[in-house]
Amino acid sequence: IADTGIGMTEADLVENLGTIAHSGTKKFMEALKQKQEGGADLIGQFGVGFYSSFMVADRVEVFTHSYEPEAASLRWSSDGREGYSIETLAEPLDRGTRIVIRLKDEYEEFSQEYRVKELLRRYSNFVGFPLNFNGEHVNTVQAIWSKSKSDVKPEEYDEFYQFIAHTDEKPLSYMHFS
């Protein structure tokens, strides 16, 4: 899993990955209140998704290089049981972050292309940014519930219904809730 975002410093790795679900209930509730007041999307902010990877992994490694000018390229590594380690890499990486999940033998199926695409579409189809797998765009439907009613076109309702219902039919009607 890779991005070309701002990357992380060693302090970021310790703060964000050093403690399981570090953000905690209080921060979650504050963010939820902000979301209800028109704030940011909550998907991906509380560590649960990242730490769930240890259910299927022997080891998870995070390779990262921050946008900060003097930042080092780093490797964070953990088996999910005995803490974690952070090391500075000799060879510099490009800015961004790459996560490598080393699967347990019994979860080898999750390395198959068809299975990864199926899981991405099932669980990440509505994230607010494009997802690509081996160069192919895989999340096809935008999260219409995150838009105001006036910003959603009728064909977007149709597409959403067709995706959810697994049909080519159009809905008889629709109602928008916010």
Task: Describe the predicted segments one by one.
Residues 42, 60-83, 104-108, 114-178:
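GHKL/Bergerat-fold ATPase module in large chromosome/replication-associated machines
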